[in-house]
């Protein structure tokens, strides 16, 4: 009897942040760990970034480069999958890209960043040439939305760019119980990019119409300046700052809140909006990045221009006062999350990218 040869799994070396890092990239990668992706492919994770002091970050980067250099000749991965962003992350990932090219291993560069204009469009000619050169070394770019594909197509051919939307884990929660119909939630890094300095003006208008409304500002960053903005408006009694939340603390906030307010100025495809969709919250956010692909204005939430304090306040007030509208928006948003943004759908698409890139690499 002939013995059927067992097919070798495609080997993936994935360059990732430490699992405890705050932010969207780590959230995406943490969903891969222990998932069906690890059954389908042989995956090795190389951590290249951590939170902490400058020296801790430097030490993690050096250790990451060392681990990667050992992986390439010993394990000979079929594909290197790099998670990157703009700014410092771009420069930290350059050695991984060029080392992969040195060993003739194809590179998938998964770009999570949001500030393309500041990093590339407004950069000097020499910096743009460097960015062009680095991205053209990659065999495939993964971007978060069709809008980002159009932007990156200025640099590399469109057929080398694949849209891979972020995903959300769909909770099985009883949405009709335990939800505070007056609680509004923000989750993210506290600062200017996320629109946090617009929050006091928005909230002043909201509490003038709905005095019982409460705002939870969950996140770290520029907490004290943001808090002072609320204090100057006499609004601190209506606002709580629990700090950065994760795990069950984050689940609890999403499950008990009624409205998700995210007045951001710049995004790729924010994980927190997907999470709010999965929990069926009434969502008020802005028309930036990949958000219009997630939220249909007047159907699954409300979209406003960044900085439109009046518009966002009016939208929040309506969702707090009209339960039926809020529940209709939330129900549609959750349905969209289930149908289009599940982890399973995301992993299936990523798996097809791996197989396509690996095949081309073997033929090269």
Q: Could you describe each region identified by the protein language model?
A:
Residues 13, 176-207, 216-218:
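Conserved donor-binding/catalytic core segment of Leloir-type glycosyltransferases
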Residues 244-245, 252-257:
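Short alpha-helical donor nucleotide-sugar binding micro-motif in glycosyltransferases
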């Amino acid at each position: 009897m002939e013995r059927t040869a067992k097919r070798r799994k495609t080997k993936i070396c994935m360059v990732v942040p430490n699992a405890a890092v705050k932010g969207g990239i780590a959230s995406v990668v943490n969903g891969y760990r222990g998932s069906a992706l690890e059954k389908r492919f042989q995956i090795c994770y190389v951590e290249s970034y951590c939170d902490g002091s400058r020296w801790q970050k430097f030490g993690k980067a050096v250790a990451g480069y060392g681990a990667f250099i050992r992986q390439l000749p010993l394990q000979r991965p079929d594909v290197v999958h790099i998670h990157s962003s703009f700014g410092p992350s771009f420069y930290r990932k350059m050695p991984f890209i060029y080392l992969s090219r040195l060993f003739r291993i194809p590179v998938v560069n998964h770009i999570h960043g949001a500030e393309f204009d500041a990093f590339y469009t407004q950069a000097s000619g020499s910096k743009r040439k460097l960015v062009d050169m680095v991205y053209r070394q990659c065999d495939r770019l993964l971007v978060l939305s069709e809008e980002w594909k159009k932007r990156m197509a200025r640099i590399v051919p469109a057929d080398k760019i694949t849209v891979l939307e972020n995903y959300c884990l769909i909770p099985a929660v009883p949405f009709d119980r335990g939800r505070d119909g007056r609680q509004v939630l923000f989750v993210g890094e506290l600062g200017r990019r996320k629109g946090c300095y617009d929050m006091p003006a928005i909230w002043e208008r909201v509490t003038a119409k709905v005095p019982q409304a409460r705002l939870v500002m969950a996140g770290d960053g520029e907490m004290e300046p943001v808090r002072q903005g609320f204090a100057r408006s006499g609004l601190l009694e209506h606002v709580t700052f629990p700090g950065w939340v994760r795990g069950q603390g984050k689940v609890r906030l999403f499950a008990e809140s009624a409205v998700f307010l995210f007045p951001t100025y710049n995004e790729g495809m924010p994980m927190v909006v997907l999470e709010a969709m999965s929990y069926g919250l009434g969502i008020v956010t802005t028309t930036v990045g990949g958000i219009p692909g997630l939220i249909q204005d007047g159907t699954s939430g409300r979209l406003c221009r960044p900085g439109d304090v009046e518009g966002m306040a009016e939208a929040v007030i309506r969702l707090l006062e009209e339960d039926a509208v809020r529940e209709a928006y939330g129900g549609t948003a959750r349905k969209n999350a289930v149908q289009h943004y599940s982890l399973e759908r995301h992993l299936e698409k990523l798996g097809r990218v791996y197989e396509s890139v690996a095949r081309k690499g073997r033929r090269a």
